[in-house]
């Protein structure tokens, strides 16, 4: 049985609801064609798909995703999956997404230890140079560095923001 996620983020500071899906097309097509039933405009949400290979990237686009999120190499929570992108793939992914009118979100959502800081800087710098839409981060070192070089940051679910006080705190980097 495949897992599906269909969730609207309702925190007041969010201007867009985010729908994420794991089975290409089904929920994406439902959301795109039936959003009025949910009392929403199409611009109120974004359909995101996790990708870890060129095949899944193409499937996300064919399935109607507005955006993809992906990790590269070691500093993301999906790094132990059997297929993963490399730093050399980053620019090509970003360009492909731009050409196909998709947003690209790079996950840098692991704990950053002291020995990881230089490597994290190189990944965030490469994301900026490649014009990735934003990074998804959980560690304060990543969040602060990305903001210091004007890279848009989205707070990862790894941060476990579960109340309005935490939301207000992290909103300063939104």
What does each of the following model-derived ranges do?
Residues 69-89, 107-116:
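Glycine-rich, proline-tolerant flexible connector loops at the mouths of alpha/beta enzymes
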Residues 30, 35-48:
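Generic start-of-chain signal for non-secretory N-termini
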Residues 1-32:
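Cationic, amphipathic, low-complexity segments that mediate targeting or membrane/lipid association
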Residues 102-173:
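N-terminal active-site wall of soluble small-molecule enzyme domains
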Residues 66-72, 137-138:
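Non-cysteine beta-strand/loop elements that form the S-adenosyl-L-methionine
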Residues 57, 90-97, 142:
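Structured alpha-helical segments in the cores of large, soluble enzyme domains
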Residues 53, 86, 90, 120, ...:
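Aromatic/hydrophobic pocket-lining residues that form the small-molecule binding cavity
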Residues 46-67:
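N-terminal basic/disordered segments at the start of proteins
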